[in-house]
Amino acid sequence: MANVLVVDDSSTMREIVATFLGQNGFQVAVATDGRDGLMQLRADPGIRLVVSDVNMPNMDGLTMAEKIRTELGNTGVRIVMLTTEDNPQLRARGKAIGVTGWIVKPFRGEAVLGPFRKLCGM
């Protein structure tokens, strides 16, 4: 059972983030886009944190976040956007949807460990 879901259409970014988190004590699942991410969340009730890109095919990260909150009724899952988008309007939309955090790529892995552990209750 995973406690973190990494959602990114870039296989390289998925691998980097998932490997880093796995090496630091997280149980990680991965998804290729928002649609796949929703399927993973439905299948694994242990997920506590979703780390997602914004711009992805099929379903973007913000739409996925909105569906997590509305369709799945899941307010216990924390959602952090890990993206190159540093746009105030997108951040505001994310906050209104219920996105917990916004991290702009590139990022330092060590800087996210503490907050991610706290969000997962570790």
Task: Kindly give the residue locations of the regions a language model identified.
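Charged docking surfaces used in two-component/phosphorelay signaling
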Residues: 15-23
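Acidic, metal-coordinating helix/loop segments flanking the phosphotransfer/catalytic sites
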Residues: 30-49, 92
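His-Asp phosphorelay/catalytic-motif detector in bacterial-type signaling
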Residues: 46-48, 73-78
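Active-site residues of response regulator receiver
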Residues: 53, 83
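Receiver (REC) domain active-site loop signature in two-component systems and cognate sites
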Residues: 56
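C-terminal output helix
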Residues: 107-116
